[in-house]
Structures are given as C-alpha cells and as structure tokens.
C-alpha cells in the first residue's frame, strides 16, 4: 500500500495521508477548508514499514481503506502549570 502525505500550511505538525497523489476526492470539503491548500511532502509505502513517526501505522492503513484518507494531528500540548499544581496538591 502506497500513500501520499501532505502537510497543512495552516496547522503546524498536521498531515493528511491520501491513497493517491493529488487525489482528495474522498476527503470531506470542510476538512480541506480547515486544513488549507495541501503541501505535498512525500510518497511512502506502508507495506514496507512497521511503524510511522507520528501515527499508528495500522490505524493509517485502516483509515485509508475505509475512508480514503487519514488525518495526523499533533498531540495536545501539556499544560505544565496544571501538572505542577496537581503535584503540589498531593
């Protein structure tokens, strides 16, 4: 399975995986609007990989088959102040 990966010009560390390069036909219009004009990053073979840097490869494969795309968003930013206050309360 080969897929194309695009980065978002609007959202840092946000990537869109699609089945074929420049084919966004299965990506919802609202998602494309909030994502911005996709910036081509690379083509990769998922068959040759056991893992991906920022996504669960099995979830990516399933999403590509079922939906035709996968959206990778960055993990939430940890609120260090809340973590510190939680530790202080203990």
Swiss-Prot record:
Residues 1-85 form the YcgL domain. InterPro entries: YcgL-like_sf (IPR038068), YcgL_dom (IPR027354). It comes from the Bacteria. SUPFAM superfamilies: YcgL-like (SSF160191). Pfam families: YcgL. This is YcgL domain-containing protein plu2139.
């Amino acid at each position: 399975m080969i897929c194309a990966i695009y980065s978002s010009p609007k959202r840092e560390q946000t990537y869109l995986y699609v089945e074929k390069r420049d084919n966004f036909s299965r990506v919802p219009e609202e998602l494309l609007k909030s994502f911005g004009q996709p910036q081509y990053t690379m083509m990769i073979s998922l068959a040759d990989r056991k893992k991906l840097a920022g996504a669960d490869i099995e979830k990516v494969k399933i999403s590509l088959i079922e939906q035709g795309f996968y959206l990778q968003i960055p993990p939430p930013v940890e609120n260090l102040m809340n973590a510190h206050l939680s530790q202080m309360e203990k």
